[in-house]
């Protein structure tokens, strides 16, 4: 076992941490500035044994990464996002098509008049009111075909109500 002594470590260049596209309970995003202070430079193999959303792996510089999680679907999502990152514009386009197909809200295109009306009546739950039927259809479609990682990603990043 190698013990790292603080005096042998160089501080990594401080930068704003990168957020993971997977929000996950136990996310290390907010801790990354403090964690990076004690990480060595020139990491060859980085082992993220409790990978979750992957915030630690995204923010560490290393030659090789090894991500582990007890939930195989979490690892599947990481592989999916890694594959899609090769053509991010196409990935965004595909997600927008799915959002439109399921009739989910999409604030990138400005205010939605239906949502604005719901906001007047349902002050705290207007998004869930708007998205409920699309969300339920998306969930049903994913449960019918769990090989659709694109549906899983959209499902977990949808509004929870």
Region locations from a protein language model:
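S-adenosyl-L-methionine
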Residues: 1-50, 55-56, 60
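Class I S-adenosyl-L-methionine-dependent methyltransferase module
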Residues: 63-161
